[in-house]
Swiss-Prot record:
This is Probable ATP-citrate synthase subunit 1. The lineage of its organism: Eukaryota, Fungi, Dikarya, Ascomycota, Taphrinomycotina. GO terms for cellular component: cytosol; nucleus. InterPro entries: Citrate_synth-like_sm_a-sub, Citrate_synthase, Citrate_synthase_sf, Citrt_syn/SCS-alpha_CS, CoA-bd, NAD(P)-bd_dom_sf, Succ-CoA_synthase_bsu_CS, SUCC_ACL_C. It comes from Schizosaccharomyces pombe (strain 972 / ATCC 24843) (Fission yeast). It is found in: Cytoplasm. Composed of two subunits. Gene3D superfamilies: Cytochrome P450-Terp, domain 2 (1.10.230.10), NAD(P)-binding Rossmann-like Domain (3.40.50.720), Succinyl-CoA synthetase domains (3.40.50.261).
Amino acid sequence: MAGSVDKPSYELFSKDTRAFVYGMQTKAVQGMLDFDYMCGRTVPSVAAIIYTFGSQSISKLYWGTKEILLPVYRTIEEACTKHPEVDVVVNFASSRSAYASTMELMEFPQIRCIAIIAEGVPERRAREILVTSKEKNVVIIGPATVGGIKPGCFKIGNTGGMMDNIVASKLYRPGSVAYVSKSGGMSNELNNIISHTTDGVYEGIAIGGDRYPGTTFIDHLIRFEADPACKLMVLLGEVGGVEEYRVIEAVKNGTIKKPIVAWAIGTCSSMFKTEVQFGHAGSFANSELETAVAKNQAMREAGIYVPETFEKLPALLQEVYEGLVKKGVIVPQPEVAPPNIPLDYAWAKELGLVRKPSSFICTISNDRGSELTYNNVPISKVFEEELGIGGVISLLWLRRRLPSYATKFLEMVLQLTADHGPCVSGAMNTIITTRAGKDLISSLVAGLLTIGTRFGGALDGAAQEFSKAYDAGLSPRAFVDSCRKANKLIPGIGHRIKSRNNPDLRVELVKGYVKKNFPSTKLLDYALAVENVTTSKKDNLILNVDGCIAVCFVDLLRNCGAFTLEEANEYINLGILNGMFVLGRSIGLIGHHLDQKRLRAPLYRHPWDDFLYLS
């Protein structure tokens, strides 16, 4: 059986167990979270969902009456990297993909237990999974299983059924009786029987009904034997296979000493003249030895408690349990009141126990407490520590605090992009709209709507193109040549007025500050090398202010220590640089609006002689 540095070898699940759910099975995940909540867990057992067909996202689920967000990852590698504490996977992959996904999961050493829910996994594939699991020291539950449950700790997928059934079977707190069965449906019946005849279930596993389960009866019974909290075991076998005989041998040779109450389902099969299969792929007898009658007799002779019929199993179980209580082996604990189960909003509105799904998600600010917070930083602290507008941008846009040189750079960008005179398209649109008598918002928006790939919108493109070329290892000349072959302009290169001999002072200011304060300027250096190539062809193909700000911004994100490379690239792709231009230029556009209003400028009409009329 699999072991762990933190857990004894017999323990698969505990109150601290964290799991992935493979497949978009939000209903099953919600059931697991509801069970966690009922058991008094402080942290949900499901750390994330792995869904290979979608994009990385989040899934909204309930934790009690509140909503929480679970990450959804596209790859197993990413999920394991982000959540190294996870060691269990509930695999809801279909029968077609269960093999491939399980084999991939076993490549990650942190995974020590996988429950395969799918039915119909080809037997050859199931055997391959079995062999690999033993090599990798991974416990496999299934295929074709509902899973398992450890009351008060963890449940696999839909094990245990609805919440009312879980409460009725007292699965929210541990008992002393552990069981193992093939059938998931019959495991629910065992939960019910054990809860009414003993102090409850300690752990229950349904190994699955296929012919080649990843683990068998004996595997789990040996675990239960080693677990001091388990005092009594129940085995529910069935016609077909010989796994019950391995249990018999373990009882005879003393490997298993704890009492077992057992029954093999399918005794009526001996009444049929031909071979009969009872539902599961492995539930048919190939010989007299595999019949339920023979198994029950053999178990009875080995000293296992076996009733005359299944109907008498509850009474026998209660008798054995009470005997252990009298001997002091089991000390019943005081019964705890069943926890309240959160109800859906429509049912619980009048009672005040509501689940109201939110329509929007906000992760940057919160106005619900006594004080407004920006990314959990109180507004008073923003002023006490003089974070400034750069600090506020770092909190609300980048969701973290940046070093002072970084926030000053953000403010520098806003100052440099605030205005570029009245003749550029954005300012002209704002001026004309203002002179038409429109209000500030309308005039501002008129100017902002001109921002795009030709005006002001080159920052994101420059950041992306230079980053891509640098990361790909292209030399500056190779980058320029590739753009020329693609008939594509290089974003951030070129100026209508400025040139190498008439440099843009704004660019010089940015370069000077960045070279002095940034820990690394690799992308800026790369862009300047590209400029050397482009200006050798034409003097005005310089690194303009958009391009300079863009590459310096990438250097900031990648080297300030607050972001991973993945996070830095994500923010660039989100359009944050164009956001900086929009925010900065809004200052100037508002200035032009106020200027025209103050001058009481009349309605503007463009002169005829500035148009070429063709009709």
